[in-house]
Amino acid sequence: KGAGVVGAAGLLSACGGSKSNNSGSTAASGAQAPNSTGATPLKEYISWESANREIESWNLLYSQTLTDANVVTNLWDGLMSFDCYGKAAPAIASSWEHNDDSTVWTFHLRDDVDWVDCNGEVKEHITATDFLVGLEWVLNASKNEANNTSMPTLYIVGAEEYYEKTKDMGAAAADLHYQDMLDAGVGIEAPDDYTLGFTCKDPCPYFDTVASYTSFYPASQALIDELGIETFRGCDNTNMWYCGPYIVEEYIQGNTKSYIPNPHYYDAANVSRFERMTVTMISDQAIAFQLYQNRELDEMDLNESTITTITSDPNNEYNSQLCEKRARPSAYAMHFNYQKNNADGTPDVNWNKAIANTAFRQCFYRGLNLKAWFSRYNKINPLKCENDYYTMKG
């Protein structure tokens, strides 16, 4: 393999020397990966994951961990996705709109999305009903064991009440189906096979991003009936159904996961996928660096000291291979107390007066030099950490 290094936080190597990334929603079976350098395109991609971050659940409706989502979102698509700026983008929903006060949202679904099994064979067509089944599963305390309920119960009319009902019913709630959810007044509807509507408790101009969350992913009633509730809850790569860009070719727990393109992926003409993508479990970064140097990994993260070693030597072979790693999907915020009291319960007049002043509050931002902190995440271009975000409406 030719070399390449991920930089601000890692190394990136590529067969033939091209740079690529593992973006999850990546083109038709056998299509070549994106290539911006003019070098030989990278067809097979070998990435890594820490050994202590092995997947625990293959069921996105049940799982609440980023570790699981990093795997299964390559295999299972939802209503919405996001572009490289974090803005909501189409997935199974091709378009959407809302009413004037953003309480009623309507999603129009593609009519060419299929469920496939682990062998890539089509099992069933996806319609709006699959999203009804998925939401009922999430809101049913007996089926999903109270996981992933926060988003729908916070935003959707009647969702919290239905969840509480299933909790009170105990094991008997396992016999409920999506029609019972609709009859209970939960704010979701499917007027036809390719239209899905949600009614929110309050105006929610950003609900398109909420609808991207795994709580709103589809599920097949046929698969649930085939496996049974407990087995579907604990499904794995061999018995789950797929609707995302990849299917799992091989999974060796604690060792590797190999993905190949889903031969029936609905968006194959518009995206690029690797012919094979392998994730190797790594116990420590020293081993990762050795594998990278032996061209057994296509990318790896670098710690700050290693980046400093590379960048301080203009002749270091890895300087030309450094590239910035995408920022973590998290943010930090300050919440001010505008009515602070003293220990004796009386108002803290000085603080309350100061914090009410806009210029004083801005000092917390303007007066902080965060460059050193940002360098921990992006040593090459630390101030870019300030700008890698998308501010949505509302």
Segments and roles (model prediction):
Residues 1-3:
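N-terminal export leaders
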Residues 11-14:
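C-terminal motif of bacterial Sec signal peptides marking the signal peptidase cleavage site
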Residues 16-19:
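Bacterial signal peptide processing site
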Residues 26-46:
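N-terminal low-complexity, Pro/Thr/Ser-rich intrinsically disordered segments
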Residues 48-101, 241:
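N-terminal lobe/hinge region of extracytoplasmic solute-binding protein
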Residues 84, 110-144, 245-377, 394:
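Extracytoplasmic/periplasmic ligand-capture domains
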Residues 168-185, 189-195, 199-272, 276:
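Gly/Pro-rich hinge or "lid" segments in bacterial periplasmic/extracellular proteins
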Residues 384-394:
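Structural transition elements
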